[in-house]
């Protein structure tokens, strides 16, 4: 699962300096609802967090809401991944740096997850030159191309991404801080995620079209 989560202390870069709201109690309620297998209750709280974050201009909290909403939907929506993909795509369209980079990396992971779950059915699809908006019609090559393209787009504005220290974004991560020196910036983390995709032999495209 994608590890990037919510608040970041690097306000100059992440632009959330004016949001001093403590979301921790609400997130604890979300976690409790999910542990009790109450996805609808979790969704109600997520809606509350999203509304609050939107009012406060806290995009990272909204990203976290979408990540958790995917987890909540998984237990009762058969098409939860497709629904999440549509939701993330809408958010991606309006996002600005560096949130757009985060969304691209998230979207790449969602498309990859959808492909992995539906790979048998997808294996019978013919590669489309004019890719349809209906991902059920995509071929393996269409998915690999989309995923690879999004991982590359997540690395746009490399110089600026390298100015965001990962330690200053530690609340975004599910990770032990002692390992932050291995990936000192947001760019390093996003790059590592992309490398893991491209280095896997099963993701080798029949025709490379990313560059």
Go through each PLM region and give its residues.
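Bacterial Sec-dependent N-terminal signal peptides
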Residues: 1-23
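Extracytoplasmic/secretory-pathway proteins
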Residues: 19-211
